[in-house]
């Protein structure tokens, strides 16, 4: 009593306390960062290594394996995958959540150093690492186009000047430049001219290398002067290499231009990038795992004007894709939903109390509680994101509940004629414990979430803490500011005013009277109610088992990613044509705003596309509907497939795949893996629960298999090293020299001119100069035949791996797909040597599925413990928790009605319902116990009176919570796919629980009371005997 009086009779101190809370919240709000979701990125580091011309199998055995053995010893590595393709190896290291990315990077560098002695000596550079996940969609894509500059010049400018500058911006993890390669002098050899002149390819390589040398020459000086010596030992352009003498034939000089075409070109001609229909260089910017996407994008945008000033006028720099507009739009939608929720909740209070003065009180207490929460969010290092703002939206219904319970009870005393200050003190004292019980038991629901590990725990922690803090501040405000305002603002009702009931008030009285009559009938038919309660429990179990489930709602971020997979024997020129064809189909779709794409590099049969959709208010279809429409058009393109998926804010794992979900096959027997992967992939492709099934196992690439006749080679004076050097010189785009420039280093690349390699007959023109100086054709000592070879070799850990990727068709859930895959694997009878498991997001979904029921049980158990401590009873908490089955049924039925799968967001809704619906029972039980203790009433009379007295606040709190969640259900626009499952779950659960718990709670109360009495009598009878 003294605690409440302290605030009621000291209004200035109470107002200033509330002002202080509000000011702290405003300051916190201004400093909070903005993000789409809480920080849930796994620390990921990518290690890259190259050995130009090496086959995928060679890269895997000689480069990937030594690095993997060394990197696998690093502490905190949760997953290690690698992919080796022509001349390139990528190793992706995913670390535990609590691993510091900078410390991990130091360990990675140390592991690379330790493995250096085991790597091939011919590698042009040491392996490097980047602190970015290559499977993440870029947060921004910049494009460079020009009508006058070549693609190589644009690439040089982008990689030399733009990329390093952007990489230095806080939050940027990686800037990947694509669409071409660095400028280079290319030497395109003419095999017939070489043969005629008796010049070997090694002669050309040695001559070029020796003619371009950068060595210190020293200095001259006398007594007074010093001269630095400088020579023309470097050749920098194709024109300078053209007259280079490489050989003498019969006394005549053979120049490089006589046997080759020398051009200023690019290092790798098998690269192409486009934006819409125009050739372009792409700068794909990815953020660090711990960086804030909005702050990083804003920093890049702030730097762009400065970069524009350094760009020549003939180069056009444009932002082709930016993830931030849809994120900002989504957050604006949530903020609008929050404002609407507050307005609706206050409207509910006004309708019930029919008093402007009374309505002002929650209109002040609710904003104070919500705004004050921002201060705690800032201190906890949180951000303004979809989940934390949704927590505040839902908290609107919770924080007003506390104020409603106090306000309604004080208003009831005022209606009875009590003076305002006395009514405020008495009313607050009566419900103080009730409000405390409601708040603490609600916070208790979230304790298991706070202790939950992994990605789901990290994802839900901000939601749980934000909501708990809002409830805690609401508890303080409702026991201090609310009663003070009631005591000083409200007036005692006059007798004639008490009788004046109109409109909603008259309807509420009629509802209360009807409820009283129906409650009497129910209390006389308790067995029927018991059957209904048991039925809801059984229905809960059946609905939870049968409802489709997924990990996280499929988001429409306005950005699509596309992976092109063409025939494994396709040429680069044909692949570039496929890229252009696919881009045209997509560009012609009315919902598409911008398209960028690239192909080439180590995998000539693959490419990537990034598609920006028009804003949601300019298109009527969702991203998934657009994908479904495009899928039909894209399927008509022969010889290649384009797999589209919507970019998501949550993506787990470092695998680069062409679809959203992955299923990985592992084996220590590579032959078994290559035998079973096609069988499994073809089986999965027939399942209606899966779409866009594809695999990263590509072992049918065209290969020309050369078999050396070693006896003949020995007789002709040729060794294997000379033969291999011939092939590398001719077809490996071999880098034979380096050109040093002030801003960068460029290569001299040698290969047979592509004009002479259009078919297999090019091998017949190759020759080796033996130890007698004779030209020996390759066909004299080697035979060749076409064969199949892998385009890539993949590992997970130290095992061979193949990852099958898939998307979900419209109307199918991840649980449907998972169950279908498990059935298919059982039907196929896959041997134990080939192990299958879900990866990435699908793996996290499997882990979350296993822990969901445990989490719900833990939340119920925690609430029971808290209520048991508060009521000093084993029985009364069970009465209060009997409200939960009806809420669960309502929530699951609502999800089924809206065709929404049970996701992590729906799980949050179930957890919230555990906290919400028990409030009705708490108010009933509190007043029933009070009536029994002080009113000398029987249990049935006490619970009946409690139900009628608390009918109005029960209706007010339920409607407040319902109207607080209703805007989430009805909201559209950006991010609605995240908000709607939460709103649907809460609204469905509240409606069903309100209909049932008004009757089941009194019956359960009486049942446990009789049970308590029965057990309490038995010991007494035993003692008497």
UniProtKB/Swiss-Prot annotation:
What turns on this gene? The mdtABC operon is transcriptionally activated by BaeR.
Question: Which compartments does it reside in?
Answer: Cell inner membrane
Q: What is its main location?
A: membrane
Query: Keyword set for this entry?
Result: Cell inner membrane, Cell membrane, Membrane, Transmembrane, Transmembrane helix, Transport
Query: Which gene name belongs to this protein?
Result: mdtC
Membrane topology qualifier: Multi-pass membrane protein
> A single Pfam family, by name?
ACR_tran
Free-text function comment from the UniProt entry: The MdtABC tripartite complex confers resistance against novobiocin and deoxycholate.
Q: Does the keyword Methyltransferase apply?
A: no
**InterPro entries, from UniProt?**
AcrB_DN_DC_subdom, Acrflvin-R, Multidrug-R_MdtC
Molecular functions (GO terms): xenobiotic transmembrane transporter activity
What residue intervals traverse the membrane? 3-23, 333-353, 360-380, 387-407, 431-451, 463-483, 528-548, 853-873, 875-895, 897-917, 953-973, 984-1004
**Where in this chain does the entry annotate a coiled-coil region?**
none
Quote the protein name from its UniProt record: Multidrug resistance protein MdtC
Q: Name one GO cellular component term.
A: plasma membrane
Q: Which family does it belong to?
A: Belongs to the resistance-nodulation-cell division (RND) (TC 2.A.6) family. MdtC subfamily.
Has the keyword Ion transport been applied to this entry?
no
Subunit composition and interactions: Part of a tripartite efflux system composed of MdtA, MdtB and MdtC. MdtC forms a heteromultimer with MdtB.
């Amino acid at each position: 009593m003294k605690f409440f009086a302290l605030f009621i009779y000291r209004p200035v101190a109470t107002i200033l306390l509330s002002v202080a809370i509000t000011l702290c919240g405003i300051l916190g709000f201004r400093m909070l960062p903005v993000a789409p979701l809480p920080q849930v990125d796994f620390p990921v580091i990518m290690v890259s290594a190259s050995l130009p011309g090496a086959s995928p199998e060679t890269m895997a055995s000689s480069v990937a394996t030594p690095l993997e053995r060394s990197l696998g010893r690093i502490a905190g590595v949760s997953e290690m995958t690698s992919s080796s393709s022509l001349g390139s190896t990528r190793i992706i290291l995913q670390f535990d959540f609590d691993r510091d990315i900078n410390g991990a990077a130091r360990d990675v560098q140390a592991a690379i150093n330790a493995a250096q002695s085991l790597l091939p000596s011919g590698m042009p550079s040491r392996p490097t690492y980047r602190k970015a996940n290559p499977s993440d969609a870029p947060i921004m894509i910049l494009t460079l186009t020009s009508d006058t500059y070549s693609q190589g010049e644009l690439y040089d400018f982008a990689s030399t000047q733009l990329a390093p500058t952007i990489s230095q911006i806080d939050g940027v993890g990686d800037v990947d430049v694509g669409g071409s390669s660095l400028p280079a002098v290319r030497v395109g050899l003419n095999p017939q001219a070489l043969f005629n002149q008796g010049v070997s390819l090694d002669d050309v390589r040695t001559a070029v290398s020796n003619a371009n040398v950068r060595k210190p020459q020293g200095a001259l000086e006398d007594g007074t002067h010093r001269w630095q010596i400088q020579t023309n030992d470097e050749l920098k352009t194709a024109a300078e290499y053209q007259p280079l003498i490489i050989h003498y034939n019969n006394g005549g000089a053979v120049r490089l231009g006589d046997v080759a075409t020398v051009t200023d070109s690019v290092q790798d001609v098998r690269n192409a990038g486009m934006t819409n229909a125009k050739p372009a260089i792409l700068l794909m910017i990815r953020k660090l795992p711990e960086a804030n996407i909005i702050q990083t994008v804003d920093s890049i945008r702030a730097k762009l004007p400065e970069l524009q000033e350094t760009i020549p006028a003939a180069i056009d720099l444009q932002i082709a894709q930016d993830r931030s507009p849809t994120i900002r739009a989504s957050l604006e939608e949530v903020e609008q939903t929050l404002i609407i929720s507050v307005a609706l909740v206050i409207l509910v209070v006004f309708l019930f109390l029919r008093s402007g003065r009374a309505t002002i009180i929650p209109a002040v207490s609710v904003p104070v509680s919500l705004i004050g929460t921002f201060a705690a969010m800032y201190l906890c290092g949180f951000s303004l994101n979809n989940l934390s703002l949704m927590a505040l939206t839902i908290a609107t219904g919770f924080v007003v509940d506390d104020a409603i319970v106090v306000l309604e009870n004080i208003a009831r005393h005022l209606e009875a004629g009590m003076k305002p200050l006395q009514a405020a003190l008495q009313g607050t004292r009566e419900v103080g414990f009730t409000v405390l019980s409601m708040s603490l038991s609600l916070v208790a629901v979230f304790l298991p979430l706070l202790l939950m590990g992994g990605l789901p725990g990290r994802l839900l922690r901000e939601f749980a803490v934000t909501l708990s803090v809002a409830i805690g501040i609401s508890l303080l405000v409702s026991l201090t500011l609310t009663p003070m305002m009631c005591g000083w603002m409200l007036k005692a009702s006059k007798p004639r005013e008490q009788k004046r009931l109109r409109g909603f008030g008259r309807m509420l009285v009629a509802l209360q009277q009807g409820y009283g009559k129906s409650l009497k009938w129910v209390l006389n038919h308790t067995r029927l109610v018991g059957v209904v309660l048991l039925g809801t429990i059984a229905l809960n179990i059946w609905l939870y088992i049968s409802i489709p489930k997924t990990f996280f709602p499929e988001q429409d971020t306005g950005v699509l990613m596309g992976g092109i997979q063409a025939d494994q024997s396709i040429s680069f020129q044909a692949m570039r044509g496929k890229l252009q064809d696919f881009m045209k189909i997509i560009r012609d779709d009315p919902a598409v705003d911008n398209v960028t794409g690239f192909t080439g590099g180590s995998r000539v049969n693959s490419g990537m596309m990034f598609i920006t959709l028009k804003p949601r208010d300019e298109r009527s279809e969702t991203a998934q509907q657009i994908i479904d429409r495009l899928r039909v058009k894209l399927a008509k393109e022969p010889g290649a497939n384009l797999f589209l998926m919507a970019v998501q804010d949550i993506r787990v794992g470092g695998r680069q795949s062409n679809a959203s979900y992955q299923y990985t096959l592992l084996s220590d027997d590579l032959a078994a893996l290559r035998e079973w992967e096609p069988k499994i992939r073809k089986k999965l492709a027939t399942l209606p629960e899966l779409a866009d099934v594809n695999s990263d196992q590509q072992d049918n690439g065209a290969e020309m298999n050369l078999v050396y006749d070693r006896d003949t080679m020995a007789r002709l004076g040729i060794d294997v090293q000379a033969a291999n050097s011939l092939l590398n010189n001719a077809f490996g785009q071999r880098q034979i020299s380096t050109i040093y420039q002030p801003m960068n280093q460029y290569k001299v690349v040698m290969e047979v001119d592509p004009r002479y390699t259009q078919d297999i007959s090019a091998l017949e023109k190759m020759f080796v100069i033996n130890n007698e100086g004779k030209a020996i054709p390759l066909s004299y000592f080697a035979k060749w035949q076409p064969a199949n070879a892998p385009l890539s070799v993949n590992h997970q850990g130290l095992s061979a791996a193949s990852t099958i990727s898939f998307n979900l068709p419209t109307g199918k859930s991840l649980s449907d797909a998972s169950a279908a895959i498990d059935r298919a694997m059982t039907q196929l009878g896959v041997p134990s040597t080939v192990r299958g498991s879900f990866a990435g997001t699908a793996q996290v979904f499997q882990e979350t599925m296993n822990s969901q029921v445990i989490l719900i049980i833990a939340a119920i158990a925690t609430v029971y413990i808290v209520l048991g401590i508060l009521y000093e009873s084993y029985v009364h908490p069970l009465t209060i928790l009997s409200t939960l089955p009806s809420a669960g049924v309502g929530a699951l039925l609502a999800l089924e009605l809206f065709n929404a799968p049970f996701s992590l967001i729906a799980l949050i809704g179930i957890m919230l319902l555990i906290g919400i619906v028990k409030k009705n029972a708490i108010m009933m039980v509190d007043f029933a116990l009070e009536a029994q203790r002080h009113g000398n009433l029987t249990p049935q009379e006490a619970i009946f009176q409690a139900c009628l007295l608390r009918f109005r606040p029960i209706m007010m709190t339920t409607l407040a919570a319902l109207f607080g969640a209703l805007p989430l259900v009805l909201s559209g626009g950006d991010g609605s796919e995240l908000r709607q499952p939460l709103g649907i779950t809460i609204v469905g659960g509240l409606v069903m629980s309100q209909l049932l718990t008004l009757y089941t709670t009194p019956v359960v109360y009486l049942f446990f009371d009789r049970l308590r009495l029965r057990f309490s009598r038995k010991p007494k009878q035993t003692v008497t005997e």
